[in-house]
C-alpha cells in the first residue's frame, strides 16, 4: 500500500506494527472457490455453500482491513504534520520569549540610564527602580 510506504518515509511507522501483512500487500485473489468445486465434478452438498459463505466473509474482512489500514496511515501522516506544526509553534514562542527578555533587559538598562540622567527625578516610563519586575506591588493590587 502506498500509504504504508508514506508512513515509512515520514518515519512514523510504529516499531510494534512490523511489516505490512502479505495479505494486504497483494491484490485480492481472483476467481471463486465454487468454480473449482464445480469443475472437479465432486458433489459436496452443503459444504459448497459454506465454502462460498466463508470466501465472501474473508473478502469482506479483507476490505475492512484495507479500509482500517488506510485510516491508520492517514491518521499517522496527519499526526506527523501536527507534530511538525507544534514544533514550529514552540520554536516561535521560544524566540518570542527570548526577544521579550532582551527587551526587558534593554528597558531596565534604559531606566538606569534615565535615572542617572534625571538625577533622582522619576521618568515617565521608569518607576525609579532599574528592574521593573522587582518593584513592590501597588497597595490597591494587594487588597
Swiss-Prot record:
Residues spanning the signal sequence: none
Domain of life, per lineage: Eukaryota
InterPro entries: DUF4530
Disordered, as annotated region: 90-143
Biased composition (Acidic residues): 90-106
Biased composition (Basic and acidic residues): 107-116
Protein name listed in UniProt: Glutamate-rich protein 4
Provenance organism: Rattus norvegicus (Rat)
Amino acid at each position: 500500500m502506498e500509504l504504508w510506504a508514506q508512513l515509512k518515509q515520514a518515519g512514523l511507522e510504529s516499531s510494534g506494527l512490523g511489516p505490512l501483512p502479505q495479505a494486504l500487500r497483494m491484490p485480492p485473489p481472483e476467481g471463486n472457490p465454487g468454480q473449482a468445486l464445480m469443475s472437479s465434478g465432486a458433489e459436496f452438498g452443503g459444504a459448497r455453500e459454506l465454502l462460498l459463505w466463508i470466501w465472501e466473509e474473508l473478502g469482506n474482512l479483507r476490505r475492512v482491513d484495507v479500509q482500517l489500514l488506510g485510516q491508520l496511515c492517514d491518521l499517522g501522516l496527519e499526526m506527523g504534520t501536527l507534530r511538525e506544526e507544534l514544533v514550529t509553534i514552540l520554536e516561535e514562542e521560544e524566540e518570542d520569549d527570548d526577544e521579550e527578555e532582551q527587551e526587558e533587559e534593554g528597558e531596565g538598562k534604559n531606566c538606569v540610564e534615565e535615572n542617572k540622567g534625571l538625577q533622582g527625578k522619576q521618568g515617565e516610563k521608569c518607576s525609579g527602580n532599574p528592574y521593573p519586575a522587582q518593584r513592590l506591588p501597588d497597595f490597591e493590587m494587594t487588597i
